[in-house]
Amino acid sequence: VDRLEITRRRAAGHQAPFSHAAATIVAAILAMPAASFAHHGLGRFDRSQPVEITGTITRIDFVNPHSYLYVDVADANGETRAMRCEMRAATLLRRSGWSEEMFVIGAEAQIFGFAHRDDPNACYLEDIKIGDTLQINRNDQLEQRTTSELRNRPLRLASGELNISGDWAQEQYVIAVAPDGRGNLVPKSMIAAVESGEIALEDVPPAGWGPRPVTLTARGQSEADAFRMWSPEDNPRLRCQPTSILFDWVFDGAVNRITQKGDRIVINYGLYSFERVIHLNMDAHPEDIEPSYAGHSIGRWEGDVLVVDTIGFAPGVIAPPVRHSGELHIVERFSLNPETMELRRDYVATDPVYFEGEYVGYDIVLPSDVPYVAHPCNELAPEFISEDASRE
């Protein structure tokens, strides 16, 4: 870590005292909207209970959906207590230049974070200082990553189709603190402008990690109200299962891969390493579709826009807490801006069982700053572990 040039977003070239940094982060996180906590993993942790611990690193699990650092801490009685502190997903850490090698077994670690609501031996890691290295925040960019070679390749395939193959990811969203003390998730490129007040939090584009505005049916509203966000039974991602082809595309900054293979397009979702196939040689869906998470997709090119029609879904969750039935129908339109290399996806979903109207949204991904990796999902939080809560 000490060989890396760390770009600090709060004060360039100055390391704030540990207590001052703690106070700043606590104030900002307390001011964040509740939805941001739900998406950012703080629901199981008490943001009103900051903790500061010093211990010896014993293990690091670099996995999705969350990585975990394990430390041995001496308590007030001199007894050794084993603790685990939750960090970001391995995919996000690697995108930020972090590595497993940073966490040297046997090294001393000073950690600032938040206490777990139920487990006294768990914490949410917000800042860390390992040995004599610099103190870093969980969202800090340790290396300036360059985007993949997607920007320097032919715009079209030999067939004439637009070339959208490659590894794609949403710009990283991290916590920024506005001058008035409010905090929220913002694109990494906007951190400085938000923290200086040049850009208001209200003008920041949403991450798209939650449900889109939609009028629900009586059944849809009732089931959304009863949805338990932190229950593996209700929330698929807590049991290492995909949520939906819409939600999983950008949630948590996953790196996805698109591969054009003539009569089909294969999409590998990086969040939980699931594959989806778009059939280009079919005018209609078959009648005997086996319902699944991804459904059955057929695509066609309208000029340079890829239009994808998908049906055949198994009942599930389109975006927590909104559920969908087997009648869900999604139409996506993928378009590429060759100047900015932004791959935009506009989508419209209908489901007469759960939606009164249309479920409409869009998202944007860019050439990824790290390659796609088929990370296994390994949910290590004890409260989520069940018979099928991890998938290798």
Which positions does each model-derived feature cover?
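N-terminal secretory signal peptides that target proteins for export/translocation
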Residues: 1-19
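PEST-like low-complexity, intrinsically disordered acidic/proline/serine-rich tracts
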Residues: 43-68, 72-392
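Boundary at the C-terminal end of the N-terminal hydrophobic targeting segment
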Residues: 36-38
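Bacterial N-terminal signal peptides
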Residues: 19-34
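Position-driven detector of the extreme protein N-terminus
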Residues: 2, 33, 191-192
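Intrinsically disordered and other compositionally biased segments
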Residues: 10-11, 28-29, 98
